[in-house]
Amino acid sequence: MYSFDRNEYERRMKWFLDARFGMFIHWGLYAIPARGEWVRSTEQMEEADYMRYFYEFDPRLYDPSTWVCAAKRAGMKYIILTAKHHDGFCLFDTATTGFKSTDTKLGRDIVKDFTYAARAEGLHVGLYYSLIDWHHKDFPHYGDRQHPMRNRPKYANEGRDFERYLDYMHAQVRELCTNYGKIDIMWFDFSYDDMRGEKWRASELVNMVRTLQPSIILNNRLECSGEGFGSLAQGHPTPYHGDFVSPEKIIPPRGIFDPAGDPVYWEVCATMNQNWGYCGTDNYYKSADMLIKKLVECVSKGGNFLLNIGPDANGVIPPRAAETLEEIGRFMRVNGQSIYGCTKSAIPKPEWGRITQKGNELFLHVYENTLGPLPLFGINAQDIDSIRQLSDGREIPLSHSWVHSDYPDMAFADLGPDPTLVDGTDTVLKLTLKE
């Protein structure tokens, strides 16, 4: 009988909650057609047509240390790679199939290279693993709403042995948990329709993973993928509930809590443009300004932010993505202490931006000027020890202007005769409360 241990849960989640910011990497054969990671499904591509990318795969500029260094410079503390996506192509040396990177012209165990590079730079290591597999002959084809051959009767499922597929899938997860050292996150994807929970033999799978990697943390996608928060949030956790909810491209309005009011931890995953995998015609990139504010929003609500890149067919981060990561990194080098180890504050969201908190330190993320002195709703001036601007450490005094004399129980900060914000995206002030 499974029993949820809140203390153990908090222990294994601590590093994750301190980190707050991570990189997602979607990379595989689909970078060659350059039409996104779902290209085989969206175009209902025959396996023979897709296999030509397998025979071609030889990224001439492949170097995972460049991905890792870009993540580190952007201020990210963990990094997750797609060890296998829905197309079934394995970026690791597996004994279960020849559809793997070591059998391509590249001839490299990409997961091995990646995990080594990440640890060398001090980043926590995560692996994404797709529960579904469009390459395996025993995974449902005809009628499955995701499979490339879903509309072709000649691919009827008679004779397919789903249990044999599950044995294959479990064996691959065992390899990932055995052959690559300490894995900090296993990011499963995804569940839909009746393909969820024990359909994956999920209790058995999670037991194996936790036995091989006792301190690993798991997402909730053995249960659900964006359709509900899962059993932990519902207050009756299953043995395969996972450790964090994984909303995709949406930030929960108020964070996530179970029925008892205890926090359920979560991580928003988001693309930098419109696709996860490389798409050569997708030039709609989110600005660094927007992404910094989304990171702050996640932390101010008690969540993490996992930002994706999709390297091209040569293994190179697209220039626009690389530039955006550099911009984010410049912000994080100055203001990282307002993100790492921080969480939501009991102080209501202010009109001028957001607040993150770590102990008795409040970080005021000021996005825009106010009409007069900066109002600090919910904070009494007598409770404030100091206010400092993170960019240069200068003191920000409290305002004593007559204009707010009608609000004696609320503090106001004086940004000076020229209140121009030093960072047009987010000027961060550290307000320290008296102990």
Where would I find each of the regions flagged by the language model?
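Mature catalytic domains of secreted/periplasmic carbohydrate-active enzymes
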Residues: 1-435
